[in-house]
Amino acid sequence: MSELQSQPKKIAVVTGASGGIGYEVTKELARNGYLVYACARRLEPMAQLAIQFGNDSIKPYKLDISKPEEIVTFSGFLRANLPDGKLDLLYNNAGQSCTFPALDATDAAVEQCFKVNVFGHINMCRELSEFLIKAKGTIVFTGSLAGVVSFPFGSIYSASKAAIHQYARGLHLEMKPFNVRVINAITGGVATDIADKRPLPETSIYNFPEGREAFNSRKTMAKDNKPMPADAYAKQLVKDILSTSDPVDVYRGTFANIMRFVMIFVPYWLLEKGLSKKFKLDKVNNALKSKQKNKDD
């Protein structure tokens, strides 16, 4: 008998469970009677959760979703241990920030961003699909407002989130015949530690006072806009998971619903003008014009 065959609880897999949203959703699922495989590259934070909630509610598993071979190994582990081969929930939450001017993002930075934010989630869905179909389960993605609005200095991250939004929407259609729900949680401001700590490259075309000021305003965007506490976000999302409704997109987090309507009713040129002012790109523009004028004089 496998380790879980006597376990009547619903079973979930959560990636990126070592902090922020994934950590809080893991706890909220455990409170709602799930056994959660809490997956992340770092086991230490999740080990504390296993102690707090008990090993019959949270089981830490070391997993780097940017490595396809680790996902295949994890799938084999689940095949050997899931009761009746059923997985009730896959929460694709692991994420990689990438905050750079578009022209400064290196091949390595772009590749890592897409490996985690896109390819890793696609691989998880493919490798775990048989368990989810058997359970008539639910697949959830942590989407982002950045996948709807391309904020300055975040074009690579925005591209990765836009890609996973479209994947989720296609998957939502394709999984309906198999009675598997797919939820894309388009996420606004949430208090997490995902913010990119890497500095502006010295060779950047934005490496002058006004450019650095604009870049720094983008890096502090989340904490400057009253982000929703991660535990409050988790409670909302778990309600969505437990619901029987089947929308593909749900909007959660600070400003998420506001931006949803902004994108419908506000012309993009006007939104772009607002973003330019908010992130101080108007100052960059003025500084460059002044510099050019001085050259011409």
UniProtKB/Swiss-Prot annotation:
Gene Ontology molecular function, alphabetical: acylglycerone-phosphate reductase (NADP+) activity; triacylglycerol lipase activity
Organism: Saccharomyces cerevisiae (strain ATCC 204508 / S288c)
GO annotation, biological process: phosphatidic acid biosynthetic process; triglyceride catabolic process
Active site positions: S18 (nucleophile), Y157 (proton acceptor), K161 (lowers pka of active site tyr)
Family from the record: Belongs to the short-chain dehydrogenases/reductases (SDR) family.
Residue window of motif GXSXG: 16-20
Entry note: thermal dependence: Optimum temperature is 40 degrees Celsius. Thermostable for 10 minutes up to 45 degrees Celsius.
PROSITE patterns: ADH_SHORT
Catalytically driven reaction(s): a 1-acylglycerone 3-phosphate + NADPH + H(+) = a 1-acyl-sn-glycero-3-phosphate + NADP(+); 1-hexadecanoyl-sn-glycero-3-phosphate + NADP(+) = 1-hexadecanoylglycerone 3-phosphate + NADPH + H(+); a triacylglycerol + H2O = a diacylglycerol + a fatty acid + H(+); 1,2,3-tri-(9Z-octadecenoyl)-glycerol + H2O = di-(9Z)-octadecenoylglycerol + (9Z)-octadecenoate + H(+)
The protein's name in its UniProt record: NADPH-dependent 1-acyldihydroxyacetone phosphate reductase
Conditions for induction: Expressed during vegetative growth with a maximum level of transcription at G1 phase, after which it is decreased during the remainder of the cell cycle.
Note: Present with 3671 molecules/cell in log phase SD medium.
A GO term from the CC aspect: mitochondrion
CDD domains per the UniProt record, alphabetical: 17beta-HSD-like_SDR_c
